Amino acid sequence: MEKKITPSELELNEFIKIINEMSGIDLTDKKNILALKLNKFLEGTNTKNFSEFLGKLKSNRQLKQETLDFVTIGETYFLRELAQLKEIIYYAKSLEKRVNILSAPCSSGEEVYSLALLAAQNFIKDMYILGIDINSSVIEKAKLGKYQGRTLQRLSESEKRRFFLESEDKFYTINKNELCTCKFELCNVFEEKFSRLGKFDIIASRNMIIYFDHESKLKLMERFHRILNDKGRLYVGNADLIPETIYFKKIFSPRGVYYEKV
């Protein structure tokens, strides 16, 4: 029987600090749940104790990625918060030009493909959607575009027939011929690579900011502002609290709330 690797209070706090520095995510409120889940994760890291794990985490690039994958696992599904997705597409269509959209984080691709699906239904062809995430496993799943089960539950049968290819094992694979250009990249919003992604008309950052501390939120707003085109829009999740900054103004419209680049 393998010995459990249990972190001390100080070690757990150090782990939370490292994750915050790497990603902006604040896990302080999830400390108790984290302590319970960490042991199983540590079994696959080939470390003798938590102190050794922390040492490796600071220098081992692969372990950093595996750890980020571990702490950023979340549930998502097609057409989540549908009213807001429709508003994004309504605004995109009103621009009457090629529209670039960034989905950050994109998780396993459901949000990106949902936007592309809605764009196709609204006869929008000249659109580019880039999905980014710091979790390498979900990025690979998004690129594959293969889904089954609960994540598809909000799609109609006609949508499945048009936008997916069904296999005998009940998996549904995205039919990319029916959609606009959708791409996915492994990217941390706080790293230099983010600044080189290009310019966007719309950023959908839903249900990520809720996990950031105040300082990280402010930093993120500045970075979003930098890659948005003039009058570009930021759409966030219902639970995301956005600090007041010089970069965006909050707009209340009949179709919902969004943040416009100042």
Curated annotation (Swiss-Prot):
Chain positions recorded as S-adenosyl-L-methionine binding sites: T76, R80, E111, D133, N188, V189, R206, N207
Domain of life, per lineage: Bacteria
SUPFAM superfamilies: Chemotaxis receptor methyltransferase CheR, N-terminal domain, S-adenosyl-L-methionine-dependent methyltransferases
Record's catalysed reaction(s): L-glutamyl-[protein] + S-adenosyl-L-methionine = [protein]-L-glutamate 5-O-methyl ester + S-adenosyl-L-homocysteine
EC number: 2.1.1.80
Any single Pfam family the record assigns to this protein: CheR
Domain CheR-type methyltransferase: 1-262
PROSITE patterns assigned: CHER (PS50123)
Name of the protein described by the UniProt record: Chemotaxis protein methyltransferase
InterPro entries: Bact_Chemotaxis_MeTrfase (IPR050903), CheR_C (IPR022642), CheR_MeTrfase (IPR000780), CheR_N_sf (IPR036804), SAM-dependent_MTases_sf (IPR029063)
Keyword vocabulary terms for this entry: Chemotaxis, Methyltransferase, S-adenosyl-L-methionine, Transferase
Role this protein plays: Methylation of the membrane-bound methyl-accepting chemotaxis proteins (MCP) to form gamma-glutamyl methyl ester residues in MCP.
Alphabetical list of PANTHER family matching this protein: CHEMOTAXIS PROTEIN METHYLTRANSFERASE
GO process annotations (BP): chemotaxis; methylation
A GO MF label: protein-glutamate O-methyltransferase activity
